[in-house]
Amino acid sequence: MKGEYYKTKASVEEYIKLAKDVNGKQLIEKFKQTLPSNSTILEIGSGPGTDWKILNEFYDVTGSDNSNEFLNYLVSKNPKGKFLELDAISLKTNMKFDGIYSNKVLHHLKDSELIDSVKRQNEILNSNGIICHSFWKGNGSEIFKGLFVNYHSIQTLTKAYKNYFEILSIEEYKEFDENDSLLLLARKI
């Protein structure tokens, strides 16, 4: 996950404009069905904070990002919010959470990096913790705007998560095109 796209102020501003009408409200509705309100949540890759704000209406959310530019933006827009600088692979924090959420973040990880992240997610979750992650559906990988994008299938996600989580569901959904995305919900085992 070493791309430079989210590291500059100009690229962060470009992303905010491009993604201004995109949010994970439908994903969060699914998350809410499995995790009680007021639970502690880590959002991996909060970006401009669009989903963080929605999550924060229901949960005690700690946002995170690996981009200082996004973190500066998040803190300036949400001065009372809790935010951490975290790498999505190592997730170096001593904090524990009831749930972990990400929206189109973990697809930037290579398969081996995703496995490392999955192990670490399991470690920082409380007993019976819930994860909710979205991915682009497809095969293979590509470099897009200097960032690695790894596409996934139900099979690849099952393989990556099954040793650490009870998979509650993996559903196809539409973000831009019919069934272009996958939503994973799982419980720590």
Where would I find each of the regions flagged by the language model?
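Class I (Rossmann-like) S-adenosyl-L-methionine-dependent methyltransferase catalytic domain
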Residues: 1-42, 47-92, 109-116, 130-189
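A conserved beta-strand element that flanks and buttresses the S-adenosyl-L-methionine
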Residues: 101
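Short catalytic micro-motifs in class I SAM-dependent methyltransferases
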Residues: 104-105
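A short glycine-rich, Lys/Arg-flanked "PGG" loop and its adjoining helix->strand segment in the class I
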Residues: 115-127
